Amino acid sequence: QKCNYNYLGEIGENELLAKSSLSPSSLIIVDTRKAARKLYKKISGKKYHLSTYMTALDRAIILKNIRKELKCLEKEFPDFKNVPEERQITIVSTSLIEAGVDLDVYTVFRELKGLDNILQAGGRCNREGKRKRADVFVFELLDSKKKAISVEMDITRDLLKKYEDISDSACIKEYYERIFSLKEASISQNTMHCICDNFRYIPFKKYAENFELIDSRTVSLVVPRDEKSRQMVADLKYKQTVDERKLQNYTCSLYKNELDDLIKQNVVDDFGTGIYCLTNLDYYDEELGLLFEASDYFL
């Protein structure tokens, strides 16, 4: 067991940050980009922020800097004792850091989610098993505007209270058995062959309307922050053509209603191509990512 999983229950932002400040390096993972941004602004000292409001290129640069800082910290303080406050590292991120990101921090704090998310978050703590004790703290933010409670969250909360080690195979087995049991009726009801035995009468239109492979509420926005990306946007504007694959590193994601707000502020244009570009870079910050008002950074 590389990590000890601890359930903190409901906790305020200030209390959470006070607890994370006791660790030489900590990773705080929250469910929304706005929550990540709010926490990041409250932190003093060496800090990093990651969310999909930032371009893929900026996220890659920040991750590179984080890895470098963590290696320097471990080299200078191999036992992680008596680390001065100015050398402590705090990372605030959304769940994007849970998938395929190679980081090893001293302590992880994960907002309550499904068991799979929490175990993935734990994979960013004591990855190589060098320390005898490493902690993952699971919390629920007090006064959070986002109070969407899911089946997965309810079951995970129960299991955190029931099992000493939630990474144990018995706990994982119970988690998926309980989810399947609760969702079995819905799965059966929405299975194509259960609804209609005759192929000719399968309501394909209805299935197409209900099926979403990717969350269609989110859209991509190009942020041209260097000469290469500015030239690609110029080609898009004047030649109406561009290699979209090359633009991927310069894109961030946002909700459709957020894009609409930026369009109303005249800071986004697609030049008639359907590929939206940020035309006012005062609405982007390399630490926070996309801003929805030019004054957002100072709030």
How should each PLM-predicted stretch be described?
Residues 100-102:
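Conserved P-loop NTPase nucleotide-binding/switch module
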Residues 107:
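Conserved phosphoryl-transfer motifs of two-component systems
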Residues 1-3, 45, 87:
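A short helix-to-beta-strand connector/capping loop
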Residues 14-29, 34, 38-41, 47-64, ...:
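C-terminal helicase lobe and adjacent C-terminal extensions/tails of nucleic-acid helicase motors
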Residues 1-14:
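Glycine-rich phosphate-binding "P-loop"
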